[in-house]
């Protein structure tokens, strides 16, 4: 891996960490799950995205939707991405980035079979302030970075934060992503 690739990887890892720190809900319930899932669905309708969406507490689905032209495979991707969040307590994209940096897979590095875990972007932990991680939001059907971005956007909008300033592209514009986030949003 070249220096530029390493820098980009490190920048994305830092940006996702900031997203997970910032995108914490004051509470989470069935209505909020429905709002989050419906927001992502609305974007999918507007942009004709062939995605599947799920919002859940661990082991309790609260929202599921498969858009036109999505594949039955997307449901399996959702399951595997969600299992990654449940195991590592961080986004599936963050896990994938960290494994890539180490040069290992879930199987070679941790003994976890790829048929059960997907380390592609699109599943994000639902973290409740003063409670911790209680579930996940997952999207499947686009490029992994775009799946991740949809989930982040939904959480940002729900929290009343400017979605563009929580996006990976914004947070990785320079090596001061953390400082930039702290200055502009918090």
Curated annotation (Swiss-Prot):
It comes from the Bacteria. Gene3D superfamilies: Haem-degrading domain (3.30.450.150). Pfam families: HbpS-like. InterPro entries: PduO/GlcC-like, PduO/GlcC-like_sf, YBR137W-like. Belongs to the UPF0303 family. This is UPF0303 protein ZMO1353. It comes from Zymomonas mobilis subsp. mobilis (strain ATCC 31821 / ZM4 / CP4).
């Amino acid at each position: 891996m070249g220096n530029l690739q390493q820098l980009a990887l490190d920048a994305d890892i830092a940006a996702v960490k900031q997203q997970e720190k910032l995108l914490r809900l004051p509470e989470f319930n069935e209505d909020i799950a429905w709002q989050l899932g419906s927001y992502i669905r609305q974007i999918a309708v507007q942009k004709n995205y062939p995605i599947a969406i799920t919002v859940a507490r661990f082991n309790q689905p609260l929202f599921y939707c498969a858009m036109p032209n999505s594949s039955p495979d997307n449901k399996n991707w959702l399951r595997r991405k969600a299992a990654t969040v449940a195991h590592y307590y961080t986004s599936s994209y963050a896990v994938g980035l960290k494994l890539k940096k180490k040069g290992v897979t879930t199987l070679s590095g941790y003994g976890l079979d790829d048929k059960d875990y997907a380390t592609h972007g699109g599943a994000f932990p639902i973290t409740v302030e003063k409670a911790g991680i209680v579930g996940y939001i997952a999207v499947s059907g686009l490029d992994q970075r775009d799946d991740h971005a949809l989930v982040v956007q939904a959480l940002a909008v729900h929290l009343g934060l400017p979605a563009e300033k929580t996006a990976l592209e914004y947070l990785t514009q320079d090596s001061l992503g953390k400082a930039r986030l702290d200055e502009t949003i918090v």
